[in-house]
Each structure stands twice: as C-alpha cells, then as structure tokens.
Amino acid sequence: MDFPQHSQHVLEQLNQQRQLGLLCDCTFVVDGVHFKAHKAVLAACSEYFKMLFVDQKDVVHLDISNAAGLGQVLEFMYTAKLSLSPENVDDVLAVATFLQMQDIITACHALKSLAEPATSPGGNAEALATEGGDKRAKEEKVATSTLSRLEQAGRSTPIGPSRDLKEERGGQAQSAASGAEQTEKADAPREPPPVELKPDPTSGMAAAEAEAALSESSEQEMEVEPARKGEEEQKEQEEQEEEGAGPAEVKEEGSQLENGEAPEENENEESAGTDSGQELGSEARGLRSGTYGDRTESKAYGSVIHKCEDCGKEFTHTGNFKRHIRIHTGEKPFSCRECSKAFSDPAACKAHEKTHSPLKPYGCEECGKSYRLISLLNLHKKRHSGEARYRCEDCGKLFTTSGNLKRHQLVHSGEKPYQCDYCGRSFSDPTSKMRHLETHDTDKEHKCPHCDKKFNQVGNLKAHLKIHIADGPLKCRECGKQFTTSGNLKRHLRIHSGEKPYVCIHCQRQFADPGALQRHVRIHTGEKPCQCVMCGKAFTQASSLIAHVRQHTGEKPYVCERCGKRFVQSSQLANHIRHHDNIRPHKCSVCSKAFVNVGDLSKHIIIHTGEKPYLCDKCGRGFNRVDNLRSHVKTVHQGKAGIKILEPEEGSEVSVVTVDDMVTLATEALAATAVTQLTVVPVGAAVTADETEVLKAEISKAVKQVQEEDPNTHILYACDSCGDKFLDANSLAQHVRIHTAQALVMFQTDADFYQQYGPGGTWPAGQVLQAGELVFRPRDGAEGQPALAETSPTAPECPPPAE
C-alpha cells in the first residue's frame, strides 16, 4: 500500500520544526540574522553540504554574504517553492551556485535571460541579428522553452521534495510563453512576466538542455585571479566576521557562535574552511577535459568541474583548484613581509603575518579601547554615539548587536550551553569549548615555534602565539604576564587591584572571578552537578570529575618526555617537570625551605604554626596533613567518615579556647548562682555518654559568653593534652574521653547538681560512681554522704556554638 502524500507531509513537518527552531542541528548567521535548519535536509538538497558534513566540522565560513538569498534557498529546501524576482534573482543565484543546487541555478539563468534588454523597439528577428542579436534570440528562445517545459511538467503533483519555483509579483500570473512575446521600448529593459514554475523530477532533460545553452552564453565570469582573490576575500571575510555582518557561518547547534564584537575569541575560526567542502564525487556530473591552461581558466560556479590529474580530486571552484595544484608542484608564491617565509595559500600567509605584530592600532578616543581593524572601531563607536540599542536588563550594559547581548546575558544566568562530548564539561562560549577540546585530541599538528607546545587547530595556535609577543597588547603592566584574550587579562588585573566584583548572596563573600563565585555557591547549596556515569559519584567541579573518571579508565594522558612518567592532570605534570628542573619558587619565611608549588609550602607552614586544619567529621580530631587524616579515617573509622578543612574567613580573628579556659569561664559564670558544692571525681570512674552531653552544654555556655564579648571571634576548641583543635563543642567533648587524665566540667545550677571531674580531685572513700549515676547534695550544703540518682538530669539547652 502506497501513501503518495506521505513525503509531502514529512516535508511540511520538517518545515514547521525549522520555523519553531525544534530539533535543528545547524544554524546560519548572516548579517546578524539566524537561520536554523536540519543538516539532513541541507545534505539532501545540496551537494556542497553533503560533502561538507562528511568532514563533521563544527564551524565553517561560507562565501555567502546576503541573508535574503539564503532565506529564499532555505525556503525552497523545505517547501519546494521559490519566490524569484528581478530584484532578488542575483542573490538567489549566488547562493545556489555556491551550494551547487542545479535546479535553482537553471531557473535563475532562465529568468535572467528573459530580463535582458532588447536591442530594438520591435524586438523582431531582424533587429536581433545585429551585434549578437542572433545569439541573444537563441538564448531567449531556449529560456522560454525551458520555463514552459518546467511549467507543464509541474502541473502534476510532485512527490517527495520536488522543486517548486514560484515567482509572485502582485498582479495576475501570466504564462512564460506570453511573456516572451511582449516587447517594450528600446531604452527600457524588458522584464519577465510573473510565472509559477513547478518542475517535476522527471524533467531533468529540459533542465540539462537549458543549463548547457545558458552556460555557453555566460558573459560574466564569477572568479578573479586566486592570488588577488584570496587576499581580498580573506580581508573582507575578517572584517565582516568581526563586525557581525560577514560570510555565513554554518554551525552545529552544540557549538553555535554569535557574530559580534569578540574578534579575539573568534580568530581561531578564520581559516576553518577547506577545499574538501567543495569537492564532489565523480558521479555528480560529467567532467570537462582539457589542458592545464583550460582547466585553470576562470569559469562560473557549477559550470565546470576541474579534476586534478595527480590525485583525482575534483573542484568546481577554479581558485580552489589552483591552490590544490600548488600542493603537487610545491609552488609557494606568497611570502611573509616580515620574515620572508613562503606559503602556497594567501590566507595562510596573512594569518602568519599576524603572529609578528597582532597589534591594534585603531583606538577609541572616548574610552581608549583599541582594535585591529578600522571597521571594528567604527562598530565600537556606536556604543558612545547611542546607536547601541540592545540593553542588558540586569546591568544596563549596551550592545550594538543582539548576538552580543545574548552572549553577555550568559554571564548573569550562569548558563553554559556548550558541552564537551568527551567529559561533559560545559562552557558559556564555543571558543572556550574548542580550546578545551585540545585536552582530548592527541593528534596535534600545529606546533608553536617558541615553546614546542602543540595544538590541533590553527586558531588555537594563533591565540597561543600572543603570549610570546614582546610588549604585546595583552601583557600585564604590573607583572609582565602575557594572555591570549582580553578577558583573561582583565581577570588577572583584579589580582593587582584587589577588585572583587562578584558577591555571594548567601554570605556576602566577594570574588574576583565569576567561576570562583559559582564554585563557592555550591558550598551553600550542596549542588554537585558533575556526576560520574560509571559509579554515580558527584562533584562540584568538572575538573574533579575528569580526574575521577580517569581513575576508572586508567587514562593518564600527560606524559613526561624526560622520564616517561604519566599523570592524570596537566597540573601534576607541570609540578613534576619543576622537580626535574629543580625550580622551587615558593620559600618558607620561617626556615627558608623552598618548595616546587604553593600547596607544598602551605602544608609545610603548618609545622611552624601548629595548626591542624584537617578535621575528622566523625570524632573531630585534627591533623596537620590530609594524608594523615585519611589514614586515621581508614584505620579508626573503617573509612566511614568524612573530612573537614578549616578555612577561616579573611580578616577574622581566631580565638583558641582550651578546656582549662572553659572550666574557668564556667566557674566564673556560676559564681553568682546558688552552687553549693563542686565535687571532683577521677576519670578512672565510669564516664557515660549522658555526662558527655552535660559537658557539651557547659562548653556551649562558656562559648556564648565569649561571643557576647566579641561577636566576630572565630572559636576553635582545643584539647589541653594533645593540642588538637576542633570546630565545635561536640567534637571536643567526644575527643576528651580519649585521655584518662582529662577534665570534664560538671557543676550545680539552681535546679540540678552537676560535678566537675579533674585529675587533682579526690573522692570519698568507699564511694564508687557507677555508669549512669550522678551525685546529688542538698542545696543548704548539709554534710553527709551524697545520694545516688538512677538517671542523669537533662542538660540545659544552649544555642549551638559558632563554627
């Protein structure tokens, strides 16, 4: 059973998805206008896209600079309808020839032939016979015949994505034949009448005949000499790219680029286009044979295929073919004006010249910001002149294009739409993602001549080379450090200025970098967005997840070239190399011992300060090294405990409160109360968990008094016997029971009687304190043996101590 309308229904659904932006995996950006599409549809309709997507490039620059023509071609792909007019036929033809869509090319040529001016008012054969009139008449006849055939063939309902070429012109539709008979005055061009063309897929012969006739009559060649063309195209493309109004960019949805004012960020895609996108299979159409001179002769797009006799590759663009030939001949006609290095391609030569002096000579008089191109400066000046009409609602910043505004809004939302397919790490801009992909790609062909660092993309190498430029535009004036982007330099300058513009909404702590703020906020929210797909363990940072995943896979991609040792992270390799070179820039101010990295120095300083910042969250014991804490957790708690790292806020005062201090404070606090007697019992007697709770309550009281005197005091709880410090009273109270001679503070309040245990105390002879028993005495202080209680009184509730 056949369903003739099924293919038409599928095409309609795809068009609706395109209009709504659903399931689109490709985006064109032309003149700031975004066109979404499906790669499968593009490849089905265009030989160019079919070959292009085989290479799977994320971003490709196309020689398409008019949004109107591209919009018409996309509309044709999804609806099989094309609105042609004398005003837009050139734009549509330019796009169609570049994308190798022969049906549209044929129709555009036919329409242009009908629109050519007549040489005489009568328009008869005799007048046409003069000055090439016979040739023009023949072309007109073929074009009219072609349009008529296509119209007749299209009267049957097309099945599948057949081409409907439709020209709408406000008035009543007329046939192509009647339009061909109309004539006008000699001084006015004769325009074609409005027609509706519906070519059937079976009308290929008519299209082929028309193509052959029209290609022979082509009077205008669409190419220039490759040397001049390459340089001019490269310059024009750069200017238009960075102004946001340049050649179309074809992008996969996962790595979409907004056009706009970030030339430093987008320079790595300037040379992304390759010849491979314009190569065709041998079955595409017949080859035109001839000598080398014939094959290099400039022809219109799609009118001839050039085949390399050495390797068999085919090209429709003469300029691409000439550049390819230089691979075999070894010819390098383009040389760098600074170092005379030779190149076979003008774009590569131009990119190389930028590495010598990527300065920005065009400066803004208003704010001093500089640009490499005058066109970018003019675009920037729109901000000051009030032409920047796109305003951010969050911070009020103005932008000249909507694309720049959208990219800026990601800063406020924290959204990172560009995700790495290998490790899941997300990025707010595609350039950062592309640079991150360097860590996964082992095939790095582009090598830095200064430091031997390698890259898999020439754009990333170009960005890296800025580091080696003496007195370059991205050099910190304070410390001389070089950066690849102005954004990185701006963040670095905050280190010297002390500026911290990013504030945590939970604790008001300030940060110089938005990424640091984002990681800090996760401490409050408990968010761990980076989850391991193998074991389910979650992490707050993507870098931690990457290192963790490599533990599963055993991957150690970073190799020391000197000893062959491999590492999970690049920072580990960098530290390892410093050991080889004996570079120890971090020196201890107390003993002058030097260390390779600042982390080792921080661990060493703890020896001098006696600090134990690594705390076991199970028992509260502190350690001066994290490896000692891990060993403790493993042996004492069988691995069922966590780790706390004590990091006091900057500028806060740290007050160490010992057990002896707490006893004194508690005694002084109770001096005015009705305390009858304090009895001291050796710890050798039974000490219960209930008594420990009593101790915690009294410690809390003492801490409360300290905090009332100075609310900003940060309190650590220290053990008198071993010096261990704890974050809270509970941890200290649990720890106290480890030492046999340690004191427990217990005292009497208005309602209950408590005791203080101490090493120097005595106990009435014959009196044994059993577990769960407390000593009660009369409030009037009457002498006698203490009475025993079956249960312990409940400890008074106190506010929790500050951590």
Swiss-Prot record:
Comp. bias (Basic and acidic residues): 132-142
Family: Belongs to the krueppel C2H2-type zinc-finger protein family.
Stretches for region Interaction with HCFC1: 637-803
Protein name, UniProt field: Zinc finger and BTB domain-containing protein 17
C2H2-type zinc finger span: 306-328, 334-356, 362-384, 390-412, 418-440, 446-468, 474-496, 502-524, 530-552, 558-580, 586-608, 614-637, 717-739
Organism: Homo sapiens (Human)
Keywords, ordered alphabetically: Developmental protein, DNA-binding, Isopeptide bond, Metal-binding, Nucleus, Phosphoprotein, Repeat, Transcription, Transcription regulation, Ubl conjugation, Zinc, Zinc-finger
BTB domain residues: 1-104
Maturation and modification: Undergoes 'Lys-48'-linked polyubiquitination at Lys-397 and Lys-481 and subsequent proteasomal degradation in a TRAF2-dependent manner.
InterPro entries: BTB/POZ_dom, SKP1/BTB/POZ_sf, Znf_C2H2_sf, Znf_C2H2_type
Gene that this sequence comes from: ZBTB17
